């Protein structure tokens, strides 16, 4: 009986370790799951527009990263952006499409803000866990986000 419990416990531990970051979130291979969304960091340096276009081609519904609370931001920092060379990644927040009406590229409402002031696109400074406006023509690493 003791051996059965030991084996069962071992199988449970193995299953949980292989089941991904969050149980119940089914993401494509290489993507990390959190709160019904999937995330993947890319080390390529691209402009904001090129990174957004790239994200939309990766997975159905995928766009540049949108953040809606500090817990999500912490998840992204801990699990996806370790490859960012300068600790700065593009976010989907921009007024490029709406001229002064800020909104996420995935259409989500802007319900969480953590920026300081400067241009038309936003970067996420992962070491400081804050956002900065910047010129959209610069190149940065980026994270794509997709519904699970």
Curated annotation (Swiss-Prot):
The keyword Transmembrane does not apply. It is found in: Secreted. GO terms for cellular component: extracellular region. Disulfide bonds join 27-38, 55-144, 121-136. It holds the Pfam family Lectin_C. Expressed by the venom gland. Gene3D superfamilies: Mannose-Binding Protein A, subunit A. It comes from the Eukaryota. The keyword Signal applies. Keywords: Disulfide bond, Glycoprotein, Hemostasis impairing toxin, Secreted, Signal, Toxin. Glycans are attached at residue 130. GO terms for molecular function: toxin activity. Residues 1-23 form the signal peptide. Residues 34-145 form the C-type lectin domain. Interferes with one step of hemostasis (modulation of platelet aggregation, or coagulation cascade, for example). Belongs to the snaclec family. Heterodimer; disulfide-linked. Shows greater sequence similarity to the beta than alpha subunits compared to other heterodimer snaclecs. This is Snaclec 6. It comes from Bitis arietans.
């Amino acid at each position: 009986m003791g051996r059965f419990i030991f084996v069962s416990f071992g199988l449970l531990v193995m299953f949980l370790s292989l089941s991904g970051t969050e149980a119940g979130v089914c993401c494509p291979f290489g993507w990390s799951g959190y709160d019904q969304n999937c995330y993947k960091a890319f080390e390529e340096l691209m402009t904001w527009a090129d990174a957004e276009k790239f994200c939309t081609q990766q997975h159905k519904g995928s766009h540049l990263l949108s953040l809606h609370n500090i817990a999500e931001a912490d998840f992204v920092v801990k699990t996806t952006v370790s490859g960012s060379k300068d600790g700065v990644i593009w976010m989907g927040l921009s007024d490029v499409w709406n001229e002064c009406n800020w909104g996420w590229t995935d259409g989500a409402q802007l319900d969480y803000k953590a920026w300081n002031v400067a241009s038309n696109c936003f970067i996420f400074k992962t070491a400081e866990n804050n956002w900065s406006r910047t010129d959209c023509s610069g190149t940065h690493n980026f994270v794509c986000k997709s519904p699970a």
